[in-house]
From Swiss-Prot:
It comes from the Bacteria. This is Large ribosomal subunit protein bL12. Forms part of the ribosomal stalk which helps the ribosome interact with GTP-bound translation factors. Is thus essential for accurate translation. NCBIfam families: L12. Pfam families: Ribosomal_L12, Ribosomal_L12_N. The lineage of its organism: Bacteria, Pseudomonadati, Pseudomonadota, Alphaproteobacteria, Rhodobacterales. Belongs to the bacterial ribosomal protein bL12 family. Keywords: Ribonucleoprotein, Ribosomal protein. CDD domains: Ribosomal_L7_L12. GO terms for molecular function: mRNA binding; structural constituent of ribosome. GO terms for biological process: translation. HAMAP family: Ribosomal_bL12. One of its GO terms (cellular component) is cytosolic large ribosomal subunit. It comes from Paracoccus denitrificans (strain Pd 1222). SUPFAM superfamilies: ClpS-like, Ribosomal protein L7/12, oligomerisation (N-terminal) domain.
């Protein structure tokens, strides 16, 4: 039981690149495909109209496409995340979340910087 708890804590503590690498290992070596949309999600009670009207306060900055000028995008990703060169390059090539839980203003600023470098970015 303690070993499983330790394993769960290690998985939760993975960085985005480590999680991407884990996904690739599970897929390539064990044939385990990630479920689209998250297989663990459970439907909760229906949200009332008041909940639907709430404005989102935290955003994920998602890199959709690095574009033609990957070097500038890698530089911006390094500046935003503090990752090393190889990790930033891997993230840019694989795509995915650059930053999680950013405020709206910070997320918009990151999006502008990445788009100025030539990347296609979404806020989720």
């Amino acid at each position: 039981m303690a070993d499983l708890k330790k394993l769960a804590e290690e998985i939760v503590g993975l960085t985005l690149l480590e999680a991407q690498e884990l996904k690739n290992i599970l897929k390539d070596e064990y044939g385990i495909e990630p479920a689209a949309g998250g297989a663990v999600m459970v439907a909760g009670p229906a949200a009332g109209p008041a909940e639907a009207a709430e404005e989102k306060t935290e955003f994920d900055v998602v890199l959709v496409d690095a574009g033609a000028n990957k070097i500038n995008v890698i530089k911006e990703v390094r500046g935003i995340t503090g990752l090393g060169l190889k990790e930033a390059k891997d993230l840019v090539e694989a795509g995915g979340k650059v930053k999680e839980g950013a405020s709206k203003a910070d997320a918009e600023e990151m999006k502008k910087k990445l788009e100025a470098a030539g990347a296609k970015v979404e806020l989720k």
